[in-house]
């Protein structure tokens, strides 16, 4: 038996990959734990866009995530990503193009008619995708439960795979928190079919369609371990950026706000680590939905080999 601690994206992907490999697994949800920060994610599968600031390993290995998610959950939308900048920030768009790959220049209105005439040009990353994080995590959980995987509180009975995110910081000395803040809005006045990233020198943002006029707007990146509600500054910056994309966002209803602490190692690269008999899958930073399946697959291969040698 393998006991996976935590039911966020890292834990559910790990449990799924271990179960796929035919290994006995259970998921331990710590009593009184807050909801996984994964549910606040953008749910963008955007390895090429991440190349603007992320190490090459995120770009190359993250490409495998799209096929993994499509094989395991419904609702993966392969419509690509559109990257824009206000006219005064046109240099940022050129810089983004130089720092990334697998894109082409487009007239934004040709892809998103609601943006016609608002931006002269944009970058289109056609091989990227997005999904609703809450729905995806719910689908993984449901599949595991159908397979007979137990979700429970209490003491683990098997080999421990620790996927508790920032809650594991006492055992991982170099794990730090990066605070993220997001909004969810609804408006019938804007129709977007794919994630739109707006570049900005101080507060870049992304807008992810959730269907039925709902949009997730995120996400701030603050080097802080402070919990608590969203700040007024974050709300103003995110809504200001959304307004730049389309003025109708000014009339949108804010239906939810969220904050979370992203678990991050110094190099911001998610990793599998060993501490005695305990295996940690952590450090997801802003790459949870992109890298959790990759590490989960690696974990399942590693544990399959080890258990085979143990017999």
For each feature predicted by the language model, list its residue ranges.
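Glycine-rich FAD pyrophosphate-binding loop
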Residues: 20-38
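Dinucleotide-binding Rossmann-like beta1-alpha1 core, especially the glycine-rich loop
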Residues: 43-113
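N-terminal Rossmann-like FAD-binding beta1-loop-alpha1 element of flavoenzymes
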Residues: 2-26
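C-terminal catalytic lobe of FAD-dependent flavoproteins
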Residues: 253-311
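Short hydrophobic core segments
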Residues: 5, 156-166, 296
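Active-site substrate-recognition segment that forms the wall
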Residues: 16-17, 21, 39, 75-76, ...
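Short beta-strand to alpha-helix junction loop
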Residues: 53-64, 123-139, 229-234, 291
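Helical element adjacent to the flavin cofactor pocket in flavoenzyme catalytic cores
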Residues: 123-155, 159, 163
């Amino acid at each position: 038996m393998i006991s996976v601690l935590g039911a966020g994206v890292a834990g559910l992907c790990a449990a799924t990959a271990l179960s796929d490999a035919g290994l006995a697994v259970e998921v331990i949800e710590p009593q009184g734990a807050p909801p996984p920060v994964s549910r606040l994610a953008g749910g963008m599968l955007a390895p090429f866009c991440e190349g603007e600031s992320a190490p090459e390993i995120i770009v190359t290995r993250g490409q495998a995530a799209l096929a993994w998610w499509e094989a395991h959950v419904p609702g993966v939308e392969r419509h690509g990503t559109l990257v824009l900048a206000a006219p005064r920030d046109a240099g940022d768009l050129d810089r983004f193009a130089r720092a990334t790959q697998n894109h082409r220049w487009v007239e934004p209105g040709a892809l998103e008619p609601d943006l016609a005439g608002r931006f002269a040009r944009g970058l289109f990353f056609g091989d990227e995708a997005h999904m609703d994080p809450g729905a995806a995590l719910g689908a993984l959980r449901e599949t595991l439960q159908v397979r007979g995987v137990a979700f429970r509180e209490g003491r683990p009975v098997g080999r421990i795979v620790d996927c508790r995110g920032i809650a594991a910081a006492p055992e991982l000395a170099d794990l730090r928190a990066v605070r993220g803040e997001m909004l969810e809005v609804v408006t019938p006045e804007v129709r977007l079919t794919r994630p739109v990233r707006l570049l900005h020198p101080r507060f870049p943002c992304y807008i992810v369609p959730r269907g039925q006029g709902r949009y997730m707007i995120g996400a701030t990146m603050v080097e802080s371990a402070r919990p608590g509600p969203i700040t007024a500054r974050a709300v103003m910056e995110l809504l200001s950026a959304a307004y730049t994309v389309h003025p109708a966002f000014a009339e949108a209803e804010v239906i939810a706000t969220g904050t979370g602490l992203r678990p991050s190692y110094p190099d911001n690269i998610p990793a599998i680590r060993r501490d005695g008999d305990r295996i940690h899958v952590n450090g997801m930073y802003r790459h949870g939905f992109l890298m959790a399946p990759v590490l989960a697959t690696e974990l399942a291969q590693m544990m399959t080999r080890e258990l085979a040698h143990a017999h």
